[in-house]
Design a protein with these regions (language model features):
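Short catalytic helix/loop segments, enriched in acidic residues and glycine
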Residues: 2-23, 116-117
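Glycine-rich, flexible loop/turn motifs
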Residues: 1-4, 59-64, 103-104, 112
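Conserved catalytic cysteine-centered active-site region
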Residues: 8-9, 36-93
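Flexible glycine-/small-residue-enriched beta->alpha junction loops
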Residues: 87, 92-118
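Short, glycine/charged-enriched secondary-structure capping and boundary segments
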Residues: 3-6, 49-52, 108-112
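Short, mixed-charge, low-aromatic patches
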Residues: 4-13, 34-41, 102-105
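Phosphate/pyrophosphate-binding loops at sites that engage ATP/ADP/AMP, CoA/4′-phosphopantetheine
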Residues: 19-33
Length: 118
């Protein structure tokens, strides 16, 4: 039960979305000043998935990156934080959004550590 995007991590999908958004907006990756990405299921995704997505989109490693991790509205909260940065004059171009790959989320079977016995 896997779809066409099953082989892509959340960071891969985030990178695709960031690259497409930058292209559509006519913004070069080097113009981005900050990246804020929400993601709920970060277990097993490696370090700083927001940075991974940014780099996959061609944004330089020198650009700061932050993850927002909460059960609901991580992506929306990332957008809110980006809006605050822009409104406060801290940045002009901030990439913000959410990313997830439910197909690649860890599968956890509670009680499996001790084994399942009758």
């Amino acid at each position: 039960m896997s779809g066409a995007l099953a082989s892509f991590s959340a960071a891969d999908l985030g990178g695709f979305a960031i690259a497409a958004a930058l292209e559509r907006a006519g913004v070069a990756p080097g113009e981005v000043e900050h990246v804020i990405m929400g993601q709920v299921l970060m277990a097993g995704q490696g370090q700083v998935p927001s940075r991974q997505a940014a780099v996959k989109a061609g944004i330089p490693m020198s650009v700061p990156s932050v993850n927002v991790n909460k059960v609901c509205l991580s992506g929306l909260n990332a957008i809110y934080l980006a809006n605050q940065m822009i409104a406060a004059g801290e940045a002009d171009i901030v990439v913000a959004g959410g990313m997830e790959s439910m197909t690649n989320a860890p599968y956890i079977a509670d009680g499996a550590r001790a084994g399942f016995r009758d």
